[in-house]
Amino acid sequence: MSESLRIIFAGTPDFAARHLDALLSSGHNVVGVFTQPDRPAGRGKKLMPSPVKVLAEEKGLPVFQPVSLRPQENQQLVADLQADVMVVVAYGLILPKAVLEMPRLGCINVHGSLLPRWRGAAPIQRSLWAGDAETGVTIMQMDVGLDTGDMLYKLSCPITAEDTSGTLYDKLAELGPQGLITTLKQLADGTAKPEVQDETLVTYAEKLSKEEARIDWSLSAAQLERCIRAFNPWPMSWVEIEGQPVKVWKASVIDTATNAAPGTILEANKQGIQVATGDGILNLLSLQPAGKKAMSAQDLLNSRREWFVPGNRLV
């Protein structure tokens, strides 16, 4: 095989842990793992380690959890490992210029989009919401900008009409490690061919918010259906009914014109709850009232039919 590289891995969530797992099976030497500090989680707010930390400790790897890499003493942790390359996957901390320049081959990042489209924090969700036909992963050389570095390798996959952010996340978590291992081989062999990003094609994937997930009935039915898939499983699209949030898990588009005001309930039956939008009709198929499990529209109508009287408006 190619030269075995000394690698520092930096990542935090499950998506990153899958890449670390692939690295550990690749024959390269992972000399240290950086991940975010343990965070309170669950009802008891008990401190919980990240998925990357759990895996790293299982494998007996040195783990470092600085709050920031700006202090000199934390940068020294990186320098002391004398790595050939640092692999960064959903780490969540900014790498200062000094850190980016420490490894012999620099730092590379696995990003969940086909750059330069969807730089930023939420590329998977934004690609779905925008109605993109495909997405993928880009392995890039990191610089001080936000996802602005030269592209080293790309792998693409189609976005289907059934994909949610959850299913797309899983697809990219399979593609990412493949692209990463290939890129490391090219770096070790000296065959990598960096490609500068075309700044005229840049779009930004801004971070999601719970308020943004509130359904805006003035949008088209097609936009809302994509939004529902893009925000599943987090933060989940929702509508307020009698003062409480009701999450919408699944919906379909009925391509029929209506003169009813956006948000007007048109029908509520075993086929779903049909609501007028800014363009077309959205058919709500699976919903989740606060404190309950997700259920079909039919099951919700059996217990809460008064919520969905035709002619009433959802706001």
Swiss-Prot record:
Residues 2-189 are annotated as: N-terminal domain. GO terms for molecular function: methionyl-tRNA formyltransferase activity. Keywords: Protein biosynthesis, Transferase. It is an enzyme of class 2 (transferase). InterPro entries: Fmt, Formyl_trans_C, Formyl_trans_C_sf, Formyl_transf_N, Formyl_transf_N_sf, Formyl_transferase-like_C_sf, GART_AS, Met-tRNA-FMT_C. It comes from the Bacteria. It holds the Pfam family Formyl_trans_C. Gene3D superfamilies: Formyl transferase, C-terminal domain (3.10.25.10), Formyl transferase, N-terminal domain (3.40.50.170). Its EC number is 2.1.2.9. Residues 210-315 are annotated as: C-terminal domain. GO terms for cellular component: cytosol. It catalyses: L-methionyl-tRNA(fMet) + (6R)-10-formyltetrahydrofolate = N-formyl-L-methionyl-tRNA(fMet) + (6S)-5,6,7,8-tetrahydrofolate + H(+). The keyword Oxidoreductase does not apply. (6S)-5,6,7,8-tetrahydrofolate binds at residues 113-116. Belongs to the Fmt family. Attaches a formyl group to the free amino group of methionyl-tRNA(fMet). The formyl group appears to play a dual role in the initiator identity of N-formylmethionyl-tRNA by promoting its recognition by IF2 and preventing the misappropriation of this tRNA by the elongation apparatus. Composed of an N- and a C-terminal domain. The N-terminal domain carries the tetrahydrofolate (THF)-binding site and the C-terminal domain is presumably involved in positioning the Met-tRNA substrate for the formylation reaction. This is Methionyl-tRNA formyltransferase. It comes from Escherichia coli O157:H7.
